[in-house]
Amino acid sequence: MNSRTLNGLPSGRFCRTSHVAFPRVDDRRVLNGIFWVLRSGAPWRDLPVYYGPRTTCYNRFVRWRQAGVWDRIMDALAAGHDAAVQMIDTSVVRVHQHGACIADNNHQDIGRSRGGLTSKIHAVVDNNGLPVHLALTPGEAHDNRLCSVLLSALLPQTMLLADRGYDANWIRELARQQGAWANIPPKRNRKDPICFSPYLYRARNLIERFFNKIKQCRRVATRYDKLAANYLAFVKLASIRIWLRANESTP
């Protein structure tokens, strides 16, 4: 052993050890692990070992989200939506205590409403109930807060379906300026008459069924994620699965 010392210790104590290079975990295994967490709602630490190390799955989920991978996939699929009819609505999700352990919940789209800590999913779907736009706000936010953003790309001749919570003159004007027609039931206190078709309005159940489908994924039905960006990424992953299943069934 070398007799030279460093701070009174033999220099041999500081020799570099050999590094073992582990093979990269296959992306398909990692993606299956991410979908397993999405469907089961389990913590990352409970991820089965055959999906790879849990830290690897979580890190790639976050890195792909930060790189915009989930957004690009969602946008590419939504580009083929049926623009004849679009429906907008929201759904409230309870926030688990594991997702509410940060100092400032307001910056993570967590609000306090009658049911406790909640977040609200805003969605726009097409004539087939397939998602087009998705967003997230605190649970106490009004349903029409994001209308100016979610409805900014309506095509001419599009029929917009929404419930009474969206009966506002500025929303109808927003649709009219884009050449679309807002078929929204009037509020009971509305004085000026409007054009509304109850028969066409019956198709609005498709967006309710969309929320039912994504909430079959337990990671969406209850928010366990502290970061709003991570939770919205899970919502988009559930929506991507709906799009893929719809495309598989199309001849």
Could you tell me what each predicted segment is?
Residues 1-251:
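Short alpha-helical elements
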